[in-house]
UniProtKB/Swiss-Prot annotation:
Cofactor section: Zn(2+); Co(2+)
Highest taxon in the source lineage: Bacteria
Source organism (scientific name): Aliivibrio fischeri (strain MJ11) (Vibrio fischeri)
Gene Ontology MF term list: acetylornithine deacetylase activity; cobalt ion binding; succinyl-diaminopimelate desuccinylase activity; zinc ion binding
Pathway in which the depicted protein is active: Amino-acid biosynthesis; L-lysine biosynthesis via DAP pathway; LL-2,6-diaminopimelate from (S)-tetrahydrodipicolinate (succinylase route): step 3/3
Described function: Catalyzes the hydrolysis of N-succinyl-L,L-diaminopimelic acid (SDAP), forming succinate and LL-2,6-diaminopimelate (DAP), an intermediate involved in the bacterial biosynthesis of lysine and meso-diaminopimelic acid, an essential component of bacterial cell walls.
Database matches in SUPFAM superfamilies: Bacterial exopeptidase dimerisation domain, Zn-dependent exopeptidases
GO biological process: diaminopimelate biosynthetic process; L-arginine biosynthetic process; lysine biosynthetic process via diaminopimelate
Protein name (record): Succinyl-diaminopimelate desuccinylase
Keywords: Amino-acid biosynthesis, Cobalt, Diaminopimelate biosynthesis, Hydrolase, Lysine biosynthesis, Metal-binding, Zinc
Gene that specifies this protein: dapE
Gene3D superfamilies: Zn peptidases (3.40.630.10)
Catalysed reactions, as listed in the record: N-succinyl-(2S,6S)-2,6-diaminopimelate + H2O = (2S,6S)-2,6-diaminopimelate + succinate
Length: 377
């Protein structure tokens, strides 16, 4: 039995070792298919990252499929049951690095658009693709740079589906209609280095920092809302000392991270952190990295179209959640766009033996096509 168009394209994409920020020819495969449909292609290379913007039509609304061709490293190959770049089907599951995150989605997007354009060559509005090879890496030269370019020429995305693996047990059981923001602080608390036997002529920055860190960890930053849980504060990294047992360190470095809801702003969180640090009379340096702002699509044509499309295919409406980490949707949402994430089951992403249900890929293709039918037919 021959492969379906979705499965065949997925296998072709998965056979390419596009470990971030490499693309390994994946985008060329997609571009050829889209050019045949009348898409105008614009390749955007920024340093080590390859991106492309493809558009069919010049009218509003502008609907976009967004995704990435890069994948995370495989890890120890001896822990894989198959070659991660030789897509293999076992018991109805397609195994390969990127099967779920997110080359499977890319194949579904392309085939869905091929079918839709074949049925509706004079469709309403415009369809576009925003594809990058820098989602799994530092996300500096990928989607964010393409969005900047589009905004500079006032080309604004109205609605966007990001193909990130949103589902939990079967495709379409969960869609993400928002994401929390991410704010990282790099804090250096300064003390005075000395001998542990003479603490009176030294100043231990670890001891000094602990009460402030305790307060930061126990502070209620907000109460969340109907769509987001309360803002969370975590310390993922802390480093101080020389490694010797008889030396009081001169500094301690603490990295902390907020995952914050729409109930808090970056300025508010930064101000409250500084107030707590100053209250404890610390000598410190503090640098901030805004990894992404929260976004939410709680109403609108896109949300309605996605919910109805999933219901048509699954005979069950999806659950709307904002859980999980950040995605490139945060950059697109800054344009004022409606953004929804709909993709495969995420149970094996970034793990060895990453896989996706072959039937789910067919259903996801149908869902994407139905979204287009609902919006642009």
């Amino acid at each position: 039995m021959s492969d379906t168009p979705t499965l065949a394209l997925a296998k072709d994409l998965l056979s390419r070792q596009s470990i971030t920020p490499e693309d390994a020819g994946c985008q060329e495969l997609m571009i050829k298919r889209l050019e045949a449909l009348g898409f105008t292609i614009e390749i955007m290379v920024f340093e080590d990252t390859t991106n492309f913007w493809a558009r069919r039509g010049n009218e509003a609304p502008l609907f976009t499929f967004a995704g990435h061709t890069d994948v995370v490293p495989t890890g120890d190959l001896t822990h894989w049951n198959t070659n991660p770049f030789e897509p293999t089907i076992i018991d109805g599951m397609l195994y390969a690095r990127g099967a779920a995150d997110m080359k499977g989605s890319l194949a579904c997007m392309v085939v869905a658009v091929e079918r839709f354009v074949g049925e509706h060559p004079n469709h309403k509005g415009s369809i576009s693709f925003l594809i990058t090879s820098d989602e799994e890496g530092p996300f500096i030269n990928g989607t964010t740079r393409v969005v900047d370019t589009l905004q500079e020429r006032n080309e604004i995305i109205d609605m966007c589906i990001v193909g990130e693996p949103s589902s939990t047990s079967h495709v379409g059981d969960v869609v993400k209609n928002g994401r929390r923001g991410s704010l990282t602080g790099n804090l250096t608390v300064k003390g005075i280095q000395g001998h542990v036997a003479y603490p009176h002529i030294a100043r231990n920055p670890i001891h000094q920092a602990m009460p402030a860190l305790s307060e930061l960890a126990t502070t209620v930053w907000d109460n969340g809302n109907d769509y987001f849980p309360p803002t969370s504060f975590q310390i993922p990294n802390m480093n101080g000392g020389t490694g010797a047992s008889n030396v009081i360190p001169g500094t301690v470095d603490i990295m902390f991270n907020f995952r914050f809801s729409t109930e808090s702003t970056v300025d508010e969180l930064q101000q409250r952190v500084v107030e707590i640090l100053d209250k404890h009379d610390l000598e410190y340096d503090l640098d901030w990295i805004i990894n992404g702002l929260p976004f939410l699509t709680d109403t609108g044509d896109l949300l309605t179209a996605v919910v109805n499309a999933v219901d048509t295919v699954n005979q069950q409406k999806p659950q709307l959640l904002t859980t999980g980490g950040t995605s490139d949707g945060r950059f697109i949402a800054q344009m004022g766009s409606q953004v929804i994430e709909l993709g495969p089951v995420n149970a094996t992403i970034h793990k060895v033996n990453e896989c996706v249900n072959v039937e789910d890929l067919e259903k996801l293709t149908d869902m994407y096509q139905e979204v287009l039918n609902n919006l642009l037919a």
